[in-house]
């Protein structure tokens, strides 16, 4: 079964399990939006692998007049996002592969959360370059994602600590989350920073890290 099918199956329960599976939930998503450096109150935003729209919801708290395009390959996840943003005419949805989809417009901000780690290293490099080119001057790229520690012992220890901090969740939901992790292809912080440099970003930083979770921020 593909990763898309796995997320489609879990769409209705996805949000309710996030805080249990991500002990740093509020800081992780909150810092990803707080670090964005864009002064206008109506940015044009693209959310890659948007899922049910959690990160976009955080963004709307900072930029309530933002025009946001949510893109995801999992149709059922986007249906949940449509419910979340019902009545907001500034929100639109695209069900497609963000590696191959062609845009005829540029954006002020490109965001993503817990999606890009499903790509191979080469795909990550391609994606970052692709969307760097779609950013306006002064545009921001933010990726809140899972990362890989190059030391296997450290990586295993970090995962163990995360398991210790997992909140209340059913055994079935926990086992399903473990199965979804088998599709993960996280890359190191250093590799992804190098990808951002090669894509031409002038400013790059890691404003947040918690065990395997990290926020990448870059600005043209």
Give the location of each predicted region.
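A short acidic, Gly/Pro-enriched loop at the edge of an enzyme's catalytic core
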Residues: 102-110
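Conserved class I S-adenosyl-L-methionine
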Residues: 1-39
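A short glycine-rich, Lys/Arg-flanked "PGG" loop and its adjoining helix->strand segment in the class I
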Residues: 125-137
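C-terminal alpha-helical "lid/dimerization" subdomain adjacent to the S-adenosyl-L-methionine
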Residues: 144-199
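Residues lining the SAM
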Residues: 112-116, 144
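Core SAM-dependent methyltransferase catalytic element
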Residues: 199-220
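Class I SAM-dependent methyltransferase SAM/SAH-binding core
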Residues: 46-48, 52-100
């Amino acid at each position: 079964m593909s990763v898309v099918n796995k997320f489609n199956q879990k769409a209705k329960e996805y949000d309710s399990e996030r805080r249990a599976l991500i002990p740093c939930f509020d800081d992780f998503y909150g810092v990803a939006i707080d670090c964005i450096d864009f002064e206008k109150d109506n940015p044009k935003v693209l959310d890659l692998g948007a899922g049910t729209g959690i990160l976009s919801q955080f963004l709307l708290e900072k930029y309530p007049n933002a025009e946001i395009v949510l893109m995801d390959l999992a149709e059922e996840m986007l249906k949940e996002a449509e419910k979340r943003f019902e009545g907001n005419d500034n929100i639109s949805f695209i069900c497609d592969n963000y590696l191959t989809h062609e845009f005829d417009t540029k954006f002020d901000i490109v965001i993503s959360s817990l999606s890009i780690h499903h790509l191979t290293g080469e795909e990550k490099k391609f994606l970052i370059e692709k969307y760097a080119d779609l950013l306006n001057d002064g545009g921001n790229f933010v990726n809140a994602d899972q990362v890989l520690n190059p030391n296997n012992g450290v990586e295993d220890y970090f995962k163990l600590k995360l398991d210790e901090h997992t909140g209340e969740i059913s055994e079935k939901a926990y086992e399903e989350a473990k199965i979804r992790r088998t599709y993960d292809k996280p890359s190191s912080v250093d590799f992804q920073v190098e990808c951002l440099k090669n894509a031409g970003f002038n400013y790059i930083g890691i404003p947040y890290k918690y065990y395997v979770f990290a926020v990448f921020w870059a600005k043209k």
